[in-house]
Curated annotation (Swiss-Prot):
Belongs to the universal stress protein A family. Keywords: Cytoplasm. This is Universal stress protein C. Required for resistance to DNA-damaging agents. Gene3D superfamilies: HUPs. The gene is uspC. GO terms for cellular component: cytoplasm. Pfam families: Usp. InterPro entries: Rossmann-like_a/b/a_fold, Universal_stress_UspA, UspA. It is found in: Cytoplasm. It comes from the Bacteria.
Amino acid sequence: MSYSNILVAVAVTPESQQLLAKAVSIARPVKGHISLITLASDPEMYNQLAAPMLEDLRSVMQEETQSFLDKLIQDAGYPVDKTFIAYGELSEHILEVCRKYHFDLVICGNHNHSFFSRASCSAKRVIASSEVDVLLVPLTGD
C-alpha cells in the first residue's frame, strides 16, 4: 500500500527531523504530499502572568514554533504542503485535521521522556480513534 497524503506530528525538538525524514521516504516514491502538525505551548498555563503579557507571550511562542517548522521544512529536501500549529489536546487536532484534509497516514514519534511522553499519550488516543493508518516511529535522542 502506498500513502499519498501524510500528516506528521512533530515537536519543537531535533528528533522531529527523524519523523519528517520517514515521511519523505514514504512520500517521495509516489510523489505524495506531506503536512506537519505541532503543539504550541499555551501561555495560559502560566497563570501567574498578567493578562496583557499572555497575548504577547502567545505571539512569541507562535513565532518561535513557526520558525522551527520553517527550518524543518527547509532542511527536509522535499516540499511540505501545509503546517498546522495547535493549542490544547494534540490528538483531537490530529483527528480533526485528518478528516478535513483527507490524510491517509499519520506519523507520530515514540519517545520515553519530555514532550514526547505527552505526544505518545496523544499517539495512543490517535491510534484508538483514527480512521486512517498511524505509523509510530521510535525516536533516538542525543
